[in-house]
Design a protein with these regions (language model features):
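Helix-loop boundary and gating motifs at the non-cytosolic
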Residues: 2-79, 83-86, 93-97, 103-111, ...
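Helix-to-loop junctions at the C-terminal end of transmembrane segments
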Residues: 78-91, 186-187, 293-307, 396
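Cytoplasmic membrane-interface "Motif A"-like loop-to-helix N-cap segments
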Residues: 88-105, 166, 191-193, 304-317
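C-terminal ends and interior cores of transmembrane alpha-helices
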Residues: 100-122, 187-188, 316-333
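C-terminal transmembrane helical hairpin of 12-TM major facilitator-type secondary transporters
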Residues: 309-353
Length: 453
């Protein structure tokens, strides 16, 4: 049989500016992008409707739910230890792969808990899933520290914003498909069998994410003449005022986000009665599509205009969304308001995340860089994420429940505890955007002027 050659040649997609980079460097940067794409599906399962439905199916209250979803960010404090271990051992690749595989593979037994602990022992079930969550979260902190340290060394500074935008775009596209598949599986396989399957899928895809790093070329960590003690490392970080200003803003901004973030899904699932597929389409796929459209634009804007003005603009625009949630009550307007909030979330918040990540990479010096990243992540996740989740759950089960009993009318329905939580979120978001961020920008400008004299 004669084979005809068409002369057509297929080029691989160019995801970022490869100018001046050798083939090995380009390949490593590409592998990191494809790795996070697999990881995104894992994150969508373990942090989306599957986790919400699974925990609620186990019968947890809003307060306990808030505590459980806070386990992962609360483990951020372990990053200080992880950074110390990394700086002392200098074995970045081994730390990343070992901790990553452990944290991802634990999702398999996590989803199987209802099959080997009977319904007659609900407390044992809760304690066991808490244990799996805690061990997975703690091992993830070693992964995060080594991964962020790798990014700071392997991504050229001139393309840092656009590269992170391209990485986010690819992972988001994959996440859209994964999110829809997860919701579809949960709807056709209801109950604990469906949850066991999707958490097993999370373990598999999360492990694929980590195994790709075997082929990544890890640049050597910077050589230090003397290894600092943990006390000296911490002291160095805590005397950097510009760095601490960034940490303070991102922490309070994160608190305003995560105070109500896990309860949006609870609210529309219980109060509005949407299916898993409908929730995933609206709460994950729709904002992800918007993120794909905007990510490279935000990345390019960060490279062209700088981090501070872009973050300031995003903060002001996104501070409106929680007010719309306040008016989401059972009725004809609820779907339209939910669509608007998730569209704005997808368009704006990824830009803020890229901006914060670029800022922390730029503001952490090469010496003891992983400790800077550890302190940043520890504070922002422990206070801005974990504490916010727990406080949100406590507010819902206590003072806001009392307000709900007043049955204040709104748009033909009565305000419930979730509406009040969304109103508090709106107030905090505006404080962050209009008071704290401008002060941080002003302080940075004063420091820059002083250094230029």
């Amino acid at each position: 049989m004669q084979v005809f050659r068409t002369g057509l040649r297929f080029r691989r997609p160019v995801l970022f500016d490869e100018t001046g980079l050798d083939k090995a460097h380009i390949r490593s940067l590409q592998l990191i992008i494809w790795a996070i794409a697999f990881g995104t599906v894992c994150f969508n399962i373990t942090g989306g409707i599957a986790m919400t439905g699974y925990l609620k199916s186990l019968g947890v209250s809003d307060f306990v739910f808030g505590l459980l979803v806070a386990v992962s960010p609360a483990a951020g404090v372990v990053q200080i230890l992880a950074s110390f271990v990394l700086e002392r051992s200098r074995k970045r690749k081994a730390v990343l792969i070992a901790s990553g595989l452990l944290s991802r593979m634990l999702w398999l037994p996590f989803g199987l808990v209802p099959f080997f602990v009977p319904m007659s022992a609900p407390l044992i079930r809760i304690w066991l899933i808490s244990l799996f969550l805690l061990v997975s979260a703690c091992s993830s902190q070693f992964l995060v520290v080594s991964y962020q340290s790798l990014l700071a060394d392997i991504i050229p500074l001139r393309i840092r914003g656009s590269y992170l935008g391209a990485r986010g775009r690819v992972s988001t596209i994959v996440g859209i498909v994964g999110g829809f598949l997860t919701a579809w599986l949960l709807d056709i396989f209801p109950g604990f069998h469906g949850y066991a399957f999707v958490f097993g899928l999370a373990a598999l895809l999360g492990s694929i994410d980590i195994t790709l790093f075997f082929a990544v070329g890890f640049p050597p960590m910077s050589v230090v003449d003397k290894k600092d003690s943990l006390k000296l490392m911490l002291s160095d970080v805590l005397h950097n005022k510009q760095f601490l200003g960034l940490v303070g803003f991102v922490t309070i901004w994160g608190f305003s986000l995560h105070l109500s973030a896990p309860f949006y899904l609870v609210y529309i699932r219980t109060s509005l009665g949407m299916s898993n597929t409908a929730i995933t389409l609206i709460a994950q796929i729709l904002p992800n599509i918007c993120s794909v459209i905007m990510l490279t634009r935000w990345g390019g804007a960060l490279d062209r205009h700088g981090i501070r003005p872009v973050m300031h603009r995003i903060a002001k625009w996104s501070s409106i969304a929680p007010l719309l949630w306040f008016f989401v009550v059972p009725g004809p307007l609820s779907l339209a308001l939910i669509l608007i909030t998730y569209i704005s979330t997808g368009m704006l918040l990824q830009g803020m995340e890229i901006g914060a990540q670029t800022a922390i990479l730029n503001r952490s010096p090469q010496k003891n860089r992983s400790m800077y990243i550890a302190i940043y992540t520890c504070v922002t996740t422990l206070v801005g994420h974990a504490l916010a989740n727990a406080v949100g759950g406590w507010l819902l089960d206590n003072p806001l429940s009392s307000l709900e009993r007043l049955q204040i009318p709104l748009l033909g329905s009565s305000l419930n505890r979730y509406n009040y939580l969304f109103l508090i979120t709106f107030a905090l978001r505006n404080i962050s955007a209009y008071l704290l961020l401008p002060r941080m920008i002003q302080h940075d400008q004063q420091v820059a002027e002083h250094e230029n004299r």
